[in-house]
Amino acid sequence: ETTGKKKAELVEEIYVTAAKAEGFRDIKGILQIRPDSSGIIHAHGYMKSNDDAFVPAYLIRSARLRTGDVIEGSLRPSRGGDKRAGLAKITTVNGMDPEQIRNRPKFGDLTPVYPNEPLRMEHGKDSITGRAIDIVSPIGKGQRGLIVSPPKAGKTTILKKICQSISINNPEVHLICLLVDERPEEVTDMQRSIKGEVVASTFDMPADNHTRVAELVIERAKRIVELGGDVVVVLDSITRLARAYNLAAPASGRILSGGVDSAALYPPKRFLGAARNIENGGSLTILASALIDTGSKMDEVIFEEFKGTGNMELKLDRDLADRRIFPAIDPVASGTRNEDLLVD
């Protein structure tokens, strides 16, 4: 159809049609850079698929791309012997012109400060959980929080309520809920309950998939923060992520009690340590659940390693949950560092 179209629009349409006829096609996905400096664009979220595309190293260098960037571009048809189609042209990076993001700051160079802008949890008259969190351990943008929970104390419900509160009270925040080693039905429930990205690696997937997805999620969050955005990552759970690293990482030879390899605790610490409030705009908030009283010595060792790393802790009480008192928050053991910056 050519009626009413300008010459430039017609030329563009002819170019696109000819490119498609030759086998070129569009792609949009998240970039993951490999150790050999080439990259892969994941076309379907954070998971590997047959539609993933190869990105040559020279394109990554010339455009100064980083893992976690969302790339839009066109693919050339795969040649004989190629596993997958290759990226021929970059159209946008993170929704912007590639030239605009060439000089963006590095995440590690940004100045971290204490959280000073609150993320209110209370919304409406029925948000008892949100009100309790606001009083006991307020959350701010850039918080590094641990939700410490024994089994069956309502941890998943509280995480869900936190996600719902953030999407209602702070719609400008980019919300990512990361579920590691979870049951598939809980993933579906979370997808239907919250407005935000739900990224899951279920318990029937290998440990190296858990670690790969977690690293890609945190890199994606860093790319948003570098451009001045606010991100909240809700992780369920840091204990299972550490277990996955313990299985997937090569053995260092130094084994702690409970069978935990000492080298396996560094990557999840790096994940949690990425949370920070940036001085001149932007923040990365991480709220991670940690399991206790599971009867596993490994879980106990993992929790002890992470106990002092957060600046906010919300502890759930099994005795309250057994008496059907919800939310089962322990007000004495819970709290936030420098909470005076978050309370009016």
Language model: regions and residue ranges:
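Basic helix-extension-helix modules of the SAP/HeH family
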Residues: 1-21
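Conserved phosphate/pyrophosphate-binding and hydrolysis machinery centered on Walker-type P-loop NTPases
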Residues: 3-8, 24-27, 45, 80-84, ...
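Flexible glycine-/small-residue-rich
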Residues: 14, 33-35, 43-45, 75, ...
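Short, charged/polar, Gly/Pro-enriched secondary-structure boundary elements
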Residues: 16-24, 95-99
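S1/OB-fold single-stranded RNA-binding interface
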Residues: 20-73
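Phosphate-interacting basic helix/loop segments used at nucleotide- and nucleic-acid interfaces
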Residues: 23-27, 128-132, 217-222, 271
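P-loop NTP-binding catalytic core
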Residues: 65-67, 77-147, 153
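P-loop NTPase catalytic core
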Residues: 154, 162-344
